[in-house]
UniProtKB/Swiss-Prot annotation:
Its cofactor is Mg(2+); Mn(2+). It is an enzyme of class 2 (transferase). Pfam families: SelO. The keyword Plastid does not apply. This is Protein nucleotidyltransferase YdiU. Mg(2+) binds at residues 262, 271. It catalyses: L-seryl-[protein] + ATP = 3-O-(5'-adenylyl)-L-seryl-[protein] + diphosphate; L-threonyl-[protein] + ATP = 3-O-(5'-adenylyl)-L-threonyl-[protein] + diphosphate; L-tyrosyl-[protein] + ATP = O-(5'-adenylyl)-L-tyrosyl-[protein] + diphosphate; L-histidyl-[protein] + UTP = N(tele)-(5'-uridylyl)-L-histidyl-[protein] + diphosphate. ATP binds at residues 92, 94-95, 114, 126-127, 177, 184, 271. Keywords: ATP-binding, Magnesium, Manganese, Metal-binding, Nucleotide-binding, Nucleotidyltransferase, Transferase. It comes from Bordetella parapertussis (strain 12822 / ATCC BAA-587 / NCTC 13253). It comes from the Bacteria.
Length: 495
């Protein structure tokens, strides 16, 4: 790979080429005296940026918001959306600044600062992000990528001593996020709600041409009928969203704020706020302290994904005024999700395929884990040990070890029906059952270290989370049960 200096990155600011109504051009108002806490060489490689640039003043200036991206076009985008099921009207990038788009070896990547100051869309916000939430977002995107789940990426984390008032006084930070696009469901809702079909068409054409060109081609992504391109777009987004929900469920991930303005049109995990990877398994686990009704609980995420797709379809109705055709596309969501989820869970259980009778086997395990407070990640990981003949670590996760053992006997009988060798089965299970996930207490340890100016915990976590399925000697503490003090940790929308 040919490494490039920051000033030599090739830019292609495609979103900025849209009509002016889609955004506001502006300059960030970043925190004072910024310091680079961490930069991500893996993300830099996506745009061909030489990691040697991390130590330059130019890198700090650009990714703190004190200087523009060379060749970029800084702006904040407008969008609308439903928040907690209620129409919230116009929203937009209230503390995010799109610096520009870079053409890298892996395609185009938009670079966006989060926390670099107010925009016309800040509403009652101050445009700031705090250290706590910025460390969590920086780590989460890389953790999800390591798990193989579609996500935005993190490039840089800059900190400042500027005070920021939240529930308490915290300090400011700026995180640089990367994605092929930050267009959301709410981007389409905005123009639909404003009854501006011309802008809606411009946005749809932009998304199709840039990311779903197959929707222009009959027999590829374009569906039959007069509005085949728009229906094809909805079908593609529906499929990606269903697959994303299956990914989340399979690793015990809760997003926490599945508002339509946080739903990526590309099926990426977007906007890491009060997210969480489950420790003790609960079917109705709520990771967001602000979600008092449990709208975005773990077991509701797939249905919320579909609800959000209905809002997207409603916004596309002007371009494809055929309710039955739109509904027919959305009717395909459940089958895609179920097949994908069952496929992922079959792998986690060591099954070559998911048969109808396996539904009961899986449901009984989840109910047992729920009733007995078993750890989600370790319960599945230790199934591989049980297959190797070491059942006790799995059974020890349950209060009623006999009940866990009885369930495992049923799984072992199911395994016997396909005749696969135990070692090969266990190895395959380890490849889909992570050992390391970004538990809240691990993120908290990294936050506390970062507050002292120490990025060492971030380094350790990135090392582990980039290879979450492979045991790495010397890091047992990062793969164990959450400590008792972790039960008191709460995350909310306050960041």
């Amino acid at each position: 790979m040919k490494w490039l200096r920051l000033q030599d990155l090739p830019t292609d600011n495609s979103f900025a080429a849209l009509p002016a109504e889609f955004y506001t051009r502006l300059q960030p108002r970043p925190p004072a005296a910024p310091r680079l806490l961490h930069a991500n060489a893996e993300a830099a490689a996506l745009i061909g940026l030489d990691p040697a640039e991390f130590s330059t003043q130019a890198f700090l200036d650009v990714f703190s918001g004190h200087a523009p991206l060379p060749g970029g076009d800084t702006l904040a985008a407008v969008y609308s959306g439903h928040q907690f099921g209620v129409w919230a009207g116009q929203l937009g990038d209230g503390r995010a600044h799109l610096l520009g788009e870079v053409r890298g070896p892996a395609g185009g990547w938009e670079l966006q600062l989060k926390g670099a100051g107010m925009t016309p869309y800040s509403r009652m916000g101050d445009g700031r992000a705090v250290l706590r939430s910025s460390v969590r977002e920086y780590l989460a995107s890389e953790a999800m990528h390591g798990l193989g789940i579609p996500t935005t990426r993190s490039l840089a984390l800059v900190v400042s001593d500027d005070p920021v008032m939240r529930e308490t006084v915290e300090t400011a930070a700026v995180v640089t996020r990367m994605a092929p696009s930050f267009v959301r469901f709410g981007s389409f809702e905005h123009w639909s709600a404003r009854r501006q079909p011309e802008q809606l068409r411009v946005l749809a054409d932009y998304v199709i041409d840039r990311f779903y060109p197959e929707c222009r081609v009959a027999g590829a992504g374009r569906l039959d009928g007069e509005h085949g391109e728009i229906l094809g777009l909805l079908a593609a987004v529906t499929r990606r969203t269903a697959l994303l929900m299956a990914d989340w469920q399979a690793v015990g991930f809760c997003h926490g704020v599945m508002n339509t303005d946080n739903m990526s049109i590309l099926g990426l995990t977007l906007d890491y706020g009060p997210y969480g990877f489950m420790d003790t398994f609960q079917l109705g686990h709520i990771c967001n302290h602000s979600d008092s009704e449990g709208r975005y609980a773990w077991n509701r995420q797939p249905s919320v994904g579909l609800w959000n797709l209905y809002r997207l379809a409603s916004s596309l109705h002007t371009l494809a005024p055929d309710p039955e055709a739109l509904r027919a596309v959305l009717d395909g969501y459940e089958a895609v999700f179920t097949q994908a989820f069952h496929g992922r869970m079959a792998g986690k259980l060591g099954l070559p395929q998911f048969l109808p009778e396996d539904e009961t086997l899986l449901d009984d395990l989840l109910q047992l884990m729920h009733q007995q407070g078993a750890d989600f990640t370790l319960a599945f990981r230790r199934l591989g040990e049980a297959v190797r003949g070491q059942r006790q670590p799995f059974e020890d996760l349950f209060i009623d070890r006999a009940a866990a053992g009885a369930w495992y006997d049923r799984l072992a009988a199911r395994h016997a029906s396909d005749g696969r060798a135990a070692q090969a089965r266990a190895a395959a299970m380890d490849e889909v059952n992570p050992l390391y996930v970004l538990r809240n207490h691990l993120a908290e340890q990294a936050i506390r270290a970062a507050a002292r100016g120490d990025a060492g915990e971030i380094d350790i976590l990135l090392k582990l989370l980039r290879n979450p399925y492979k045991q790495q000697p010397g890091y047992d503490a990062y793969a164990g049960l959450a400590p008792d003090w972790a039960a008191g940790l709460e995350v909310s929308c306050s960041s």
